Amino acid sequence: MSISTFNFQFYNYKLSPSSPGFGSTASRSSSSCISELEMDIDEDMSAQPTITSTPKPRFTSQLAVELAKTEPGNGISPLRPKLHTAQKRWSMELREKVLEMSKRNNGQEKPQTARQQEQRQPQEQPLQQEELQHQQQEPTVTDKINFFNKLTNTFESGFSKLMPQASSTNNRFIAMLRTARPQNVATTTANSSTANSFLGSDHSLSGSVTGQVPPPKPKRLSATTAQFATPHVPAMGVGKGGSQRKCSLRRKPSMDKSRATISRQSSSASVRTQNHAIMEDLSLVVPVRLRIAEYEQRISMSA
């Protein structure tokens, strides 16, 4: 259907000027009152007066009805051509054109009657043959997949050519696993050969990376690195943790502390920029060790 910007309530309401009764049921049921929306596309619309593109006010008085009656040709001829009907026509014509083109592409150019006669005669005989052909021709899903794989150069499609010796396995992924060189897993251990041993890699391959140095750990946490989160966290004893804690609170700057930490401790509360109070405190609610232990446990579970 053509979509027009008209307000249908207004401009689509037509009185047949002949009927004297203003809102009479007879005029309402007549064909001129069926709105364009309710109409089927394929219905012939030439009988109906067009909706003019210049909107006319709908009749409000008996006098207006009389005037409309005297007007030649059912009112003013529209300024623009009959927009709405024409659009419908065009859509129908387009449909027909498309149909014709598709027929032409399918090689059916003969007039219909001849075609139908031809079809009727040999129809019965080649039915069985067609069925057989269909069974032979119709490609299976795997065929289609393979076809498109050959069509597009994906990593997988070229894979069998690169490594013909691994093609004994039909599973490409496993073949890839077998042929891939061992990766150096990013770990903090000093030599990656030990880290890689669970992958079964050769030590000769990973020897190049043996020079790695583990990243420095903060001094206070180094004692408890291996400790996992447990329901009861051992309380910090005076002997071990207490002394460390005391010296961390002291103002004396030490080498392993970051500059930010030092400045934060040395500045008084009035000087310091106000961070959001709650956010600042929240980081102290969970003791650092516990948090780190929790992260470690998470990592070990995910691995």
Swiss-Prot record:
It comes from the Eukaryota. The keyword Cytoplasm applies. Restricted to the blastoderm. GO terms for molecular function: actin filament binding; phosphatidylinositol-3,4,5-trisphosphate binding; phosphatidylinositol-4,5-bisphosphate binding. Residues 102-142, 185-272 are annotated as: Disordered. It is found in: Cytoplasm, Cytoskeleton. Residues 115-138, 185-197 have a biased composition (Low complexity). One of its GO terms (cellular component) is actin filament. Residues 260-272 have a biased composition (Polar residues). Keywords: Cytoplasm, Cytoskeleton, Developmental protein. Acts as a regulator of the microfilament network governing cellularization of the embryo. Determines the timing of a key conformational transition in the cortical microfilament network: the proper coordination of membrane invagination and basal closure of the cells. To do this, bnk possibly physically links neighboring contractile units of the early cycle 14 microfilament network in a manner that prevents basal constriction until the proper stage has been reached. It comes from Drosophila melanogaster (Fruit fly). Signal peptide: none annotated. This is Protein bottleneck. One of its GO terms (biological process) is actin filament organization.
